[in-house]
């Protein structure tokens, strides 16, 4: 069975798929990457049995194109800011830092990667809160990962840690599900977004082969008690 899944699910799906394979006997060949890029590959003819996206929009498009019948929300996440571990970036108010043009802000690539789309939503929130500041941040933020032309992140490295270590940004806006793993990286610090900018995002999956029993079993496992516990243990958030 083949699974296409958002790259932000790799940490959580690695133990989840191992548990599923042990319990069910079904083997899963997983491909991880930017959800928008994976959705385009499906539209162009590739056919995994299951698609798990970091948003609802990409699987909804596949439903609209009759590649799938329904979208199932299965977990949630939120954004955070990872900063270089220096007092100038760890001590001041994060909202102040985001509005300070001296700091370079990195994101993932909008459209190709939902994380980049969520960063754009954050800029929208900031613009409503402080008119002019959201548009200014949007204009100077740089998409550093997740796009077709983005430089690859070395194996075993997290994008936020690598990009900050390579001095490509001072602040990186990405998923909070990486926070525990990033906490082990001394050169960076994870900071939660201020309440006025914080929001949760919903991940959705769809079956692309409704008649494939193993795929049905995988979806049931992800949505079931054991799958949900693994997702939450690995930093994802429960559906509310």
Could you tell me what each predicted segment is?
Residues 1-24, 29-31, 36, 40-46, ...:
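Exported/periplasmic ABC-transporter solute-binding proteins
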Residues 66-72:
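Central helical "cap/lid" subdomain
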């Amino acid at each position: 069975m083949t699974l296409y899944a958002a790259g932000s699910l790799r940490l959580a799906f690695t133990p989840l798929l191992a548990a599923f394979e042990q319990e069910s006997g079904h083997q899963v060949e997983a491909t991880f990457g930017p959800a928008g890029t994976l959705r385009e590959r499906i539209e162009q003819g590739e056919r995994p049995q299951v698609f798990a996206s970091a948003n609802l929009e990409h699987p909804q498009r596949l439903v609209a194109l009759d590649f799938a019948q329904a979208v199932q929300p299965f977990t949630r996440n939120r954004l955070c800011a990872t900063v270089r571990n220096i007092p100038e970036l760890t001590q001041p108010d994060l909202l102040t830092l985001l509005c300070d043009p001296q700091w370079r802000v990195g994101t993932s690539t909008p459209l190709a990667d939902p994380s980049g789309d969520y960063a754009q939503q954050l800029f929208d929130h900031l613009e409503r809160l402080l008119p002019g500041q959201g548009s200014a941040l949007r204009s100077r933020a740089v998409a550093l990962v997740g796009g077709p032309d983005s430089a690859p992140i070395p194996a075993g490295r997290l994008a936020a840690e690598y990009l900050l270590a390579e001095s490509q940004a001072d602040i990186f806006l990405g998923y909070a599900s990486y926070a525990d793993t990033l906490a082990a990286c001394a050169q960076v610090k994870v900071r939660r977004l201020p309440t006025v900018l914080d929001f949760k995002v919903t991940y959705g999956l769809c079956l692309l082969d409704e008649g494939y029993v193993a795929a049905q079993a995988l979806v049931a496992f992800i949505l079931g008690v054991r799958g949900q516990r693994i997702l939450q243990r690995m930093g994802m958030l429960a559906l509310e």
